[in-house]
From Swiss-Prot:
This is Putative lipase ATG15. Residues 507-570 are annotated as: Disordered. The lineage of its organism: Eukaryota, Fungi, Dikarya, Ascomycota, Saccharomycotina. Lipase which is essential for lysis of subvacuolar cytoplasm to vacuole targeted bodies and intravacuolar autophagic bodies. Involved in the lysis of intravacuolar multivesicular body (MVB) vesicles. The intravacuolar membrane disintegration by ATG15 is critical to life span extension. The keyword Cytoplasm does not apply. It comes from the Eukaryota. Its EC number is 3.1.1.3. It is found in: Endosome, Multivesicular body membrane; Prevacuolar compartment membrane. The active site is at 364 (charge relay system). CDD domains: Lipase_3. It comes from Candida albicans (strain SC5314 / ATCC MYA-2876).
Length: 597
């Protein structure tokens, strides 16, 4: 029994020893494997870290650094100032920003506003829901870049070169043959552009467009300049109460966002006043905004009817406008296009364009100005819900590389099919724009159009509320998984029924268009000339005589003509739209008219 017990004990000890050796072996092998693979794991981690850094470098953030204000109008067009958004500035106005952030954090109870009240629509708060509770002055916005090519003027950044070119192009009426003789130097550059296929980048640019509506702390110190820096050689009289600064008078405003490495700069140009944050309103720069709207987007100085006050004196007679006058009005120093050129010049004084990627963006009027500025200097431009600016581009004779396709212009227009201003249908006697005093008669855009078809996809109806940048960001862009596809604009022509003339002896006016409204039932006179040979024995000579025969012919018509058919063109209307005078475009005032009473 004792031997048997010892045998079982030895057997148990051997099994324990075997298990022990097995465990030790496994642990040893595991340690060896970990030790061997440590180097490869470290290399993989380093590679992953590099890839993450590349991703973060591709997706940087933008933050508001400067605000530029350029005065316009006859009084303040020489006024130009800059406000730097520094940490000291943010600390100085911390109570205001705290209050503003609380206001933006609260749910907005939007009052019921009729879609035909444009002024109240503009006065609504338009800060996007996605950024509620964030300070517009310190918000950081992500973005991504993409590689692209740009063809632009070599001397575009030379002082006064662009202005001299535009003056020369205006003097020669934009004649392409003459412009080609001066042999402009075009260069091809590899540049960085916003990645318009990335939804976050598009939202960022739209937010910058919305940020341009933001008002700054409006206290007495700010009114008297305090933080503003004078630019240029003109310093207004600070004791003159008629000269206001910043937001308080007519002018153009640009909010400048800069990346952390100072390599990317985005200029957000303010659109039509009224669509601001709490504390804003249509009384900021609304009057001058409307003047520039009507100058840029109407056929002839907002000449809709004799009841309208035109913004310039270029109208001559029914559907006839002076082209030279229009071009000079757009280039005046107190208008927005000249102001945006000078604003860009002052931005490039801080951020040299040779070493900085400069983009421009804006909403509505600001988007159109961004497109004009981008085409002038060859900058990438992204516009949101902008009216058609092709007509203004041609009137300004902006430089365009010969043969450059639209997809290489680096201009993108984002819009939706339910916005009547973007679609160019907010016109006519009963339209909301006309009732509010806006002559939005243009439809055609330059560059690429990126259109969200919300009418088909969401069943929306055309409504001015869909023009707001807040609606565009929260209810359109963020509700789609991808950004809208961008495509070249279809063939388009604005103001086809207008005749633009130039009072220059060396310049031929546009020929009169054939009148399709002439009544086909009127009798016409046709003159037939025949040569008849006749023989004469007088003096033995033969002579030929020409007989002119005039006959009256009438076209064959199944309908019996009346004695006095009414003309087909309305030349004069009452204020409520009733036509009181009929005639033709080429008729005199006292001939071929029909009065309806």
């Amino acid at each position: 029994m004792t031997l048997e017990k010892n045998r079982h004990a030895n057997k148990g000890t051997s099994w324990t020893w075997m298990i022990y050796k097995f465990v030790v072996g496994v642990i040893t092998v595991a340690i060896l494997v970990l030790f061997i693979t440590q180097k490869s794991v470290s290399q993989a981690q380093d590679k992953l870290r590099v890839e993450q850094q590349a991703i973060f470098s591709d997706q940087d953030t933008l933050q508001l650094k400067h605000i530029f204000h350029h005065g316009t109008g006859p009084k303040n067009y020489r006024l130009h100032r800059r406000l730097d958004i520094t940490s000291e500035y943010l600390a100085k106005h911390q109570p205001y920003f705290t209050t503003l952030t609380q206001q933006l954090s609260e749910p907005v109870l939007e009052e019921h506003i009729a879609s035909d009240n444009l002024d109240k629509i503009y006065q609504q708060s338009d800060w996007p829901e996605i950024h509620k509770g964030k300070n517009p002055f310190s918000i950081e916005l992500p973005f991504k870049k993409a590689d692209s090519e740009a063809t632009r003027l070599k001397e575009r950044n030379t002082l006064n070169f662009i202005e001299s070119y535009l003056n020369y192009a205006r003097d020669i009426k934009g004649d392409a043959q003459i412009l080609n003789r001066i042999n402009l130097d075009w260069i091809h550059d590899e540049i960085k552009v916003p990645n318009v296929t990335d939804r976050d980048t598009v939202v960022t640019l739209a937010t910058i467009s919305s940020n341009a509506y933001v008002r700054y702390p409006k206290d007495d110190d700010e009114k008297r300049k305090s933080d503003w820096i004078d630019l240029g050689d003109w310093d207004p009289n600070r004791e003159d109460d008629d000269v206001n600064f910043g937001w308080d008078d007519i002018g153009l405003r640009g909010h400048v966002f800069v990346s952390k490495d100072n390599k990317t700069v985005v200029i957000g140009i303010k659109g039509t006043s009224g669509a601001g944050l709490p504390g804003g309103g249509s009384d900021e720069t609304g009057g001058n905004d409307k003047t520039n709207d009507n100058l840029l987007f109407s056929c002839c100085c907002a000449r809709i009817s004799y009841m309208w006050t035109t913004v310039c004196d270029c109208y001559e007679k029914t559907y006839t406008c002076n082209q030279d006058c229009l071009e000079k009005e757009l280039r005046k120093e107190d208008k927005y296009y000249q102001a945006v050129l000078e604003l860009y010049r002052n931005v490039t004084d801080i951020y040299p364009p040779e070493s900085t990627d400069i983009w421009v963006t804006g909403h509505s009027l600001g988007g159109a100005l961004a497109s004009l500025l981008g085409r002038t200097f060859g900058l990438p431009a992204v516009a949101f819900e902008a009216p058609g600016e092709m007509l203004a581009t041609r009137r300004l004779h902006l430089p365009s590389p010969p043969g450059l396709p639209q997809h290489m212009e680096n201009i993108w227009h984002f819009g939706n099919t339910a916005d009547p201003i973007y679609m160019g249908v907010c016109n006519g006697a009963s339209s909301t724009c006309n009732l509010a005093g806006y002559a939005m008669e243009t439809t055609c855009h330059t560059g690429l159009q990126c259109v969200y078809d919300v009418v088909t996809d969401k069943g929306w109806s055309v409504n001015l509320l869909n023009h707001r940048i807040h609606t565009v960001i929260d209810d359109i862009i963020l509700t789609y998984n991808e950004t809208a596809p961008c495509a070249p604009s279809p063939p388009c022509r604005d103001c086809f029924n207008w005749r633009f003339v130039a009072h220059d002896d060396n310049e031929k006016d546009e020929p009169k268009l054939p009148n399709p409204l002439r009544s086909s039932s009127k009798s016409t006179l046709s003159t037939k000339t025949t040569s008849l040979k006749s023989s004469s024995t007088y003096s033995g000579s033969t002579s030929s005589s020409t007989v002119t025969k005039t006959t009256q012919t009438s076209p064959i018509s199944s309908a019996s003509p009346t004695d006095q058919d009414p003309p087909k063109k309305c030349l004069k209307r009452t204020w409520y739209g009733w036509c009181t005078k009929w005639g033709y475009d080429d008729d005199d005032d006292d001939e071929d008219t029909f009065e309806r009473k």
